[in-house]
Amino acid sequence: ANITQGGPNCSRPAALILGQYYQFIRLGFQGYKEVQYNSLTIAKYIHDEIGKMAPFVNYSDEVVNPLFIWYLKPEYARAAKWTLYDLQDKLSQHGWMVPAYTLPSKLEDYVVMRVVVRQGFSRDMADMLLGDIKNAITELEKLDYPTPTRMAQEKNLPVETKIFNHGCRTHKK
């Protein structure tokens, strides 16, 4: 076949990759490195601050990419009237997209939350997110009765979430 003309298909997934190439060319290696370093620095800051919060454990001790996950401490989760799904809902009321979901097969007992720090996410925004997490925890700890997601976990029933959940049941730890 004779192909005389070709053009890139800028569907959504390809657009992100092309955008990264453009940024790399525009900023140069050093500029792009600084952008990534800033994202990583903010991710490490949020990771460390979440690790200091009583209910949480970070899944890993180190942050090597501008993303990380955490989960409820098992001893905290046993007594809590809420789950990370409830925290996800509270944060979404303030405009944050911090998903809670189960890990894949053989780790599906863990419900985790994930933060991905994107380019342009500032230290001020990180402080706002951390403040909203702390406020949401304070509200959730005042509950008199368990939330529906907490009751579903207690009964080992599937939890309906707004985020992908690997189709697994959640188990209490």
Locations of the language-model features?
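Mobile "lid/hinge" segments at catalytic clefts and subdomain interfaces of large enzymes
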Residues: 15-17
